[in-house]
Structure formats: C-alpha cells, structure tokens
Amino acid sequence: MSMAVETFGFFMATVGLLMLGVTLPNSYWRVSTVHGNVITTNTIFENLWFSCATDSLGVYNCWEFPSMLALSGYIQACRALMITAILLGFLGLLLGIAGLRCTNIGGLELSRKAKLAATAGALHILAGICGMVAISWYAFNITRDFFDPLYPGTKYELGPALYLGWSASLISILGGLCLCSACCCGSDEDPAASARRPYQAPVSVMPVATSDQEGDSSFGKYGRNAYV
C-alpha cells in the first residue's frame, strides 16, 4: 500500500511541476478590458515578463518590460519565487526517480530509498509553497488596485494563469506529502535490515557426566577380558 501511495505522490508531484512550468510563461496572468477605445485597443493582458494588447481586429502586439529595475518589487519577487519553485521541483523529480521502490538505480537499499523519497517530497512541498506565495502575492496586488477607487492606472482582473498556478502548487504540495510518507514505513519493510545485524553463534550447554557414566566409561576402558 505504501508503494502505491509513494508512486501516486511522485506522479502528482510530476504533474504539479509540469503545470508550474506552463504557468510561468503563460501570458494571461492578469487581463483588462479597456472600454474607452474599442478601435485601437480592446484587451490588455500581462504576465511577469511582457505585456500584450489586442485591437478590435484581433491583432495583438507584445512588448517586454523595458527595465527590470523599473518594475514593481512584487513582480521581481514573483519571478524569483516561480523560478525557485521550478528548480526545487526539478531537483525533487530527480531524487524521486532514484528514491522510488519500483526503480533500481545504483542498487540502493530500501532505507536509503526512503530517505531520498522523503527528501524529494520535502523539495516538492517547498516548490508548491513558493509557487503558492508568488501567485497569491500577484493576485493580492491585482485585487487591491481593482478595488481602490483612487488608483489612476489601468485596472486588471485575475487571469486564467493564476488559477492554473494555484492548482499546480496544491498538487505539488500533496504529491510531496505522499512522498514524505515513505520515510516512515521504508525502514520497517527493509528485508536487508536483518542481514546487516551481527552474527551471533548459538549457545549450547554441554551435559555434565554422572557417576554411572564414569563407571561405564572406566569399564569400557579395560575391556571384558581384563576380569577373566
């Protein structure tokens, strides 16, 4: 049962990592509909790297942000958190492949495989937390500006990439928790643990010779012809 949970957790963590990788370059982190000028610009959508605008004919133009230092602090932090989440998830994926019990890489014992699987699970949990913090922080700034009546700039709404990122972070955390469960039961099911115990020779108690046995042995020593 634990092997099935471990394999399922690895599958969930892999899916979460792939979804995080799709979320990062997605263009629809925030979307805004501009009602004032429907001839030239209809919709503006942005992500962490660039901004795009579509006109009424369906033609869109994209441009990257001009300077990283000129960006808001939360956008720079979200970039760093998302990249960190993907790197942690990728490292956890490599350790998870080596730590699964259904794989045979390097001839590792089950106890060591359990430790590798638990480490991979912890990395996936950290990756999910980093992604969750980045996306929630970005969404908080969108909603704060949207409900601020004194905000002079363009107001945006939550884009579909944020919902994808929230789902990816949650899946990564759940997959990491399933992988961490292997650390608890991996050592108990290790058949090689008993083989590593030191050898103990069996203790046998020698019987003490009685007087009758001594008499028989002395009689047998002289033989029958000695008394004839």
UniProtKB/Swiss-Prot annotation:
Q: Which residues lie on this side of the membrane: Cytoplasmic?
A: 1, 100-115, 183-228
What's the impact of mutating D55N? Decreases ion conductance and cation selectivity. Strongly reduces Na(+)-selective paracellular transport. Does not affect the integration into tight junction strands
UniProt GO cellular component terms:
bicellular tight junction; lateral plasma membrane; plasma membrane; tight junction
Q: In which tissues is it expressed?
A: Detected in colon (at protein level).
Question: Protein name, please?
Answer: Claudin-15
Q: Name where it's found.
A: Cell junction, Tight junction; Cell membrane
Topological domain, Extracellular: which ranges? 25-74, 141-159
Identify the gene encoding this protein. Answer: CLDN15
Residues annotated as transmembrane: 2-24, 75-99, 116-140, 160-182
Effect after changing D55R: Reverses the charge selectivity for paracellular ion transport, favoring Cl(-) transport
InterPro entries in the cross-refs:
Claudin, Claudin15, Claudin_CS, PMP22/EMP/MP20/Claudin
Q: How is it modified after translation?
A: Palmitoylated.
Domain of life of the native organism = Eukaryota
Region annotation (Important for the formation of tight-junction strand-like structures) maps to 146-147
Q: Where is this site: Important for Na(+)-selective paracellular ion transport?
A: D55, E64
Function field: Forms paracellular channels: polymerizes in tight junction strands with cation- and water-selective channels through the strands, conveying epithelial permeability in a process known as paracellular tight junction permeability. In intestinal epithelium, allows for sodium and water fluxes from the peritoneal side to the lumen of the intestine to regulate nutrient absorption and intestinal morphogenesis.
Q: What is the effect of changing W63K?
A: Does not affect assembly into homopolymeric strands, ion conductance, charge selectivity or pore size
Principal place where this protein is found? other
Q: Which reaction does it catalyse?
A: Na(+)(in) = Na(+)(out); K(+)(in) = K(+)(out); Cs(+)(in) = Cs(+)(out); Rb(+)(in) = Rb(+)(out)
| Positions of modified residues (Phosphoserine) | S111, S211, S218
Q: Which PROSITE patterns match?
A: CLAUDIN
